[in-house]
Amino acid sequence: MPAAPHPVEIWTLTLCNLGRRPRRLSVFALAELSLLTDVSLYGHASYLHGIKLARSHGVAARKVGMNLPNPYYSAIFLSSRRPTSWEANLNAFKGQFRTLANPIALARGRCCGGISSRDPVGAVLHFQLRLAPGASPRTDFLVGAADVFKVEAEASRYVRNYLQSGSLADDHFARMRGTDEVDVLRRGRWERQ
């Protein structure tokens, strides 16, 4: 995305059903919002917590420590689509003795909706999608910095500016959107799509 007036990055996920039958997909999007810096901060985890941003379809990590010189000690992960379930606690998403390669939320088929306090913040948004034949739904994701004391307000502004139809981002995306190709197993053969 070209330089914008806000500290954000936008990703687009488009899934296409090229088959003849309707499909159901369970999609998990994850952004680890650690808020770590080069500066050694004593008690980093003590000041860190993750919250749900219900109106903005996302999760935020907030770090409210003593005498913080930088108001942008908050990070957000938003979606243009309402998630089916969500999680703000990376450890709850992974599960005990598990890793990101085999998280418990994937085995359960949904997130628990937990907040995070003194645990790593993993902004996880889960979507149950139904794709009709030929359908290709698009979901935009935004990762950005926000003022720690105005997280909800800034998340709402980011949604208006970048994730809603007709937003600033739509014009930029129309000019620069590219398509990644992946290999798909179809009728026993790998095909590039």
Per-range role (PLM):
Residues M1-R108, A155-V184:
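Polysaccharide-binding surfaces and accessory modules of carbohydrate-active proteins
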Residues R23, L129-D147:
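Short Pro-Gly-centered flexible turn/kink motifs
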Residues S40-S46, I115-L125:
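Short beta-strand and strand-turn-strand segments in soluble, beta-rich domains
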Residues G95, T99, G113, D119-P120, ...:
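Glycine-centered flexibility motif
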Residues R118-V121, E181-Q193:
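Substrate-binding groove/exosite segments of carbohydrate-active enzymes
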